[in-house]
From Swiss-Prot:
It is found in: Cell membrane. Residues 127-146, 933-971 are annotated as: Disordered. Belongs to the TrbL/VirB6 family. It is a multi-pass membrane protein. Keywords: Cell membrane, Membrane, Signal, Transmembrane, Transmembrane helix. Its main location: membrane. It comes from the Bacteria. Residues 933-944 have a biased composition (Basic residues). Residues 945-954 have a biased composition (Basic and acidic residues). This is Uncharacterized protein RT0030.
Length: 971
């Protein structure tokens, strides 16, 4: 029991292993794609005789089509491009003839080089980091991710508010795409930014309540020093309101400033008669100061709103004073050094209703602004961030007259990957305009706004700008110059099928393709072969730009390849060679029989001599018999004999050969061709042949079978229709093979008939002379009968073949009348998956085997059927053609009453022998098959005899055992 279980388990293990191997093999096959090309049923012009081929290839920007497996640190493997296969040509699998027109359309986007941080960037300049402003601490250039690379974060640059100068964020060439974003204002939290120069993460405290911040916090201030925060009314603060003292002197008063001091003293000794100017002790509003900036608050109370006008981004705190000349302290004299200390901004700062004490209830308290934030109060953009384009990329502080303030792009243009899982922005885009300019190169520059007259070293904070850039961007095969001439042009070369330009070591002359704005173009092949393509890029620096390239083009091909003509390629050369040889041999026989224009009679026998002798003998014999009364003659017989003598004597004429060659020979040998041509409606001649070809009606069907790629694809596509498709394929293939065999038999019959006719005409002088005597008359009659038989035998045969060929062509189009594409045809799915996994995975294939399939067939929606009636009709017609060849031979034999071998029999034998010789190369000829069959029968007989002998021995043994058992029982 245990051993049986082990056997069962062993069998199951073997089966499981085989299944694994089969699935692995099918998986590899399913991964094979030669493109998604299609063979169209009709060409674009609607005419036949051409293969209308469409194909689509993927042209990689890096020109690398081979992957290798790389082991990752976590133990997993990853497929990466083979580092040794960049910059290679791709075989499009499109075969063209010389001067054949190829139409194509290039669709897609590629980036043909990688962008790197420029010098004098937002974080470092050549002044602060000489010679290394664009290099990291390892002296390596810093690459910028591409715009379309959603899986890579942008490069972050820390923008310090202390740097009040224009700096570069991107070097732009024509058609470059750039995506500039700003990191948010980190409120009440820490900020973390990748420092791409140091290769580390920088984390700083960005919580509110501080008056200075690191640049990565997303806020900055240009304010420092002191500013007025309140106003206080100070009594008796200064002396003002100058006036003259009242005079009480009887004799009148004098003015102190107009007299000497001793005079005033004397005048005042008796009474106060010398008066002076006096001042009142006046109050004034004095300033109360605080330090700038005020501590940042997340509620936005000290934050500027976004504006695109610089006047809205600056408050001149130095101009805000509680009273006039408050910054000039009183000197205690009368009058004071200034005479105006009236309130200035007291109401705005302290409030209208506050009239004493310290006042700080004015509107100013609500309008104090010190901070600019990256999220931009109001949400329109990062406040105070300005940008410009600069052609030189130089660092400068000058501000243009018109400032461009950065704004957030619309919500619909914000990349979804720039948000976290909670929908909060990690980066917010402020610039996404492709660089399209007549200028070859320019730099995108940014700076934080601040007055140029202000000392920026006292500024605090800053922003973090993030950059993605797609450099050397091209669309739809268009090309133009950047630092490399004509970068992005799609190039092609045409090489022979056995040649690989990537390994041949040859030097080629690539042709560039000029496309329109939609990527459409066409060209004429300069030679025959396969088209190879690649995208032109800078090959220098060890193919660095190819290695940095990304993206691909879809190149859609459409071309019409003229199908080779069976008539021109096969029949015309065959008939040209055969007819020339046979006609030459026949005329040579005729000429040798009559020694036509021969100066040396040793190489020929002049049959005219024998004809003369026979004719003389005939006249003498018949005349003697008539004179002696042995022969009776009437008028009818006399006329017949004179006609015979005249016909035979005509052969003695020296112009006999010209007559036969110029009139009779061509008329008789071409008789069949003319009748066949009239029946089929096809011409006997083409532009390339001078020998008549009656098989022109076969050109369409045979050219399609032998030379049409579309037909081969249509036939193979039957295999994609499932099990029924295999049956369809076998039946259709057999029908096509029968037609081919029938065609070859018909050609053989025609050749034999033509050769027999030519030979019979060549020996005509001999048989015509047999007309004279009654005992040789039957030879002449048979000669005439066979000549007529061989003349009409091809005509009768072709009459039926022509009709059946047309029917076969029609029904073949019914069966295979569809366009064909190379695509997924046989999906491999896990059986019983619905009982294990959710029903949603029931119809999901693991992989798919690609094959030729009819246009429009979808493996997911079921197989496409073929009308079986048409296939049956196709087979019936094919068998009818095959049988008609032999039937036509028997029909002609009865019509002409000519016994003996016919051209049909001879041609059949010839085609049979040729076929057997061909099959013998693979061991499938009749003799080999017969030998295999006989040996198999012999082995089978030997096996049967062995089994019979073993059975007899077994019966004898059992009988002996039974006898021994009976004897033991009796005892």
């Amino acid at each position: 029991m245990q051993s049986n279980l082990l056997k069962v388990l062993g069998v199951l293990a073997i089966v499981a292993t085989l299944v694994c191997f089969i699935f692995a093999a099918l998986g590899m096959i399913g991964a094979v794609r030669i493109g998604n090309g299609c063979y169209m049923r009709y060409s674009k012009d609607g005419n036949g005789g051409a293969d209308s081929i469409t194909n689509t290839i993927t042209l990689n920007a890096n020109a690398n089509y081979f992957n290798i497996s790389k082991m990752l640190p976590d133990g997993t493997t990853k497929l990466i491009p083979d580092p040794n296969r960049y910059g290679e040509w791709l075989n499009t699998q499109v075969l063209v003839e010389k001067n054949q027109q190829v139409n194509l359309q290039v669709v897609g986007q590629v980036s043909l080089c990688l962008a790197y941080l420029p010098k004098n960037n937002l974080q470092f300049t050549e002044r602060t980091r000489p010679g290394k402003s664009n290099l990291d601490d390892s002296n390596q250039m810093i690459p910028i991710p591409r715009v379309q690379d959603a899986n890579s974060p942008p490069v972050s640059l820390i923008m310090d508010a202390k740097n009040n100068e224009w700096r570069n964020i991107a070097e732009l060439y024509a058609n470059d795409k750039v995506l500039v974003s700003v990191s948010p204002n980190f409120a009440n939290t820490d900020a973390t930014v990748d420092d791409v120069f140091k290769g580390v993460k920088v984390t700083k405290d960005c919580t509110q309540g501080k008056t200075s911040y690191y640049p990565i916090c997303g806020k900055y201030s240009i304010y420092s020093g002191k500013y007025v925060t309140a106003c206080e009314l100070k009594q008796n603060y200064w002396k003002g309101n100058v006036h003259r003292e009242e005079c009480y002197c009887v004799f009148g008063c004098i003015y102190q400033e107009e007299n000497e001091q001793w005079i005033c003293d004397a005048a005042n000794s008796a009474s106060h008669c010398c008066t002076s100017l006096v001042c009142d002790s006046l109050p004034a509003w004095i300033n109360h100061y605080s330090n700038m900036p005020e501590a940042y608050k997340d509620d936005g109370s000290f934050t500027f709103s976004w504006s695109d006008k610089s006047g809205n981004l600056l408050i001149d705190y130095q101009d805000l004073q509680c009273s006039n000349n408050v910054q000039i302290p009183p000197n205690g004299e009368c009058p004071d050094i200034v005479d105006n200390r009236n309130p200035k901004d007291k109401d705005y700062i302290g409030g209208v209703h506050c009239t004493s004490g310290i006042c700080k209830d004015g509107d100013f308290q609500k309008n104090r602004k010190f901070w600019y934030t990256a999220d931009g109060k109001g949400g329109k953009g990062p406040t105070g961030l300005i940008y410009q384009m600069n052609n030189t990329g130089s660092v400068s502080q000058a501000l243009p007259s018109n400032l461009e303030f950065a704004k957030f792009v619309p919500e619909t243009e914000q990349p979804p990957e720039y948000k976290d899982k909670n929908g909060k922005y990690l980066y917010k885009v402020i610039y996404n305009i492709p660089f399209n300019s007549n200028i070859e190169k320019s730099y995108l520059q940014y700076r934080l706004w601040s007055p140029t007259s202000q000392d920026s070293s006292k500024n605090t904070g800053g922003y973090v700008l993030n950059i993605k850039q797609t450099k050397c961007y091209r669309e739809n095969g268009n090309s133009f110059k950047d630092i490399f001439d004509d970068r992005g042009r799609v190039q092609y070369i045409i090489v022979q099928s056995s040649e690989n330009p990537n390994t041949s070591g040859k030097t080629y002359a690539p042709q560039g393709i000029n496309v329109d704005s939609d990527g459409k173009s066409h060209f004429n092949a300069n030679e025959a072969g396969y088209i190879w393509m690649k995208i032109l890029n800078d090959p220098s620096n060890n193919l660095k730009d190819y290695k940095d390239s990304e993206g691909s083009y879809k190149v859609h091909f459409s071309t019409s390849l003229k199908v080779g003509s069976f008539t021109i390629k096969v029949m015309n050369p065959l008939l040209q060679l055969f007819k020339t040889k046979v006609q030459g041999a026949a005329t040579s026989i005729f000429k040798n029989m009559v020694c036509y224009k021969s100066t040396d009679n040793t190489s020929c026998t002049n049959f005219f001599t024998y004809i003369k002798a026979i004719l003389i003998l005939y006249v003498m014999t018949y005349g003697a018999m008539f004179l002696l009364g042995f022969a009776k003659i009437n008028q009818k017989e006399l006329v017949i004999r004179i006609a015979k003598i005249g016909m035979v004597s005509g052969l003695i004429n020296g112009n006999t050969f010209e007559f036969f060659n110029n009139y009779l020979f061509d008329a008789i040998t071409n008789f069949s061709d003319s009748i066949i041509a009239n029946m089929s409606g096809y011409s006997l001649f083409t532009s390339t042949n001078t020998i008549s070809n009656p098989f022109m009606f076969l050109d369409a069907i045979m050219s399609k079978i032998f030379f049409s790629q579309t037909f081969i694809a249509q036939l193979l596509s039957l295999l994609s229709l499932g099990l029924s498709g295999i049956i369809y394929f076998i039946i259709t293939f057999i029908a096509v093979c029968i037609v081919i065999i029938t065609t070859l038999r018909a050609i053989a019959v025609y050749i034999m008939a033509f050769m027999a006719t030519c030979i019979l005409i060549g020996i005509a002088p001999l048989f015509i002379s047999f007309l004279l005597f009654d005992f040789t008359r039957y030879l002449f009659d048979n000669w005439v009968r066979f000549t007529i038989r061989y003349m009409i035998e091809p005509v009768v045969m072709m009459a039926g073949i022509i009709v059946l060929t047309q029917l076969f062509t029609i029904y073949l189009d019914f069966v295979l009348g569809y366009s064909v594409c190379w695509k997924c045809t046989l999906p491999i799915k896990i059986p019983f998956i619905g009982t294990i996994l959710p029903i949603a995975l029931l119809n999901v294939p693991i992989f798919c085997i690609n094959w030729f399939a009819p246009w429009g067939m979808d493996y997911m929606s079921g197989m496409m059927g073929v009308n079986m009636q048409n296939i049956v009709a196709l087979v019936i017609i094919a068998y009818g053609m095959y049988g008609y060849v032999e039937f036509s031979g028997r029909m002609v034999a009865k019509l002409t009453s000519a016994a003996g071998p016919s051209a049909t029999q001879i041609g059949d034998r010839m085609s049979h022998d040729a076929g057997q010789k061909t099959l013998s190369q693979i061991g499938m000829d009749y003799r080999t098959r017969k030998g295999i069959t006989s040996r198999a029968k012999s082995r089978l007989k030997q096996r049967n005899r062995t089994l019979e002998h073993a059975e007899q021995n077994s019966k004898k043994y059992m009988k002996k055992i039974g006898e021994n058992t009976n004897e033991g029982t009796l005892k």
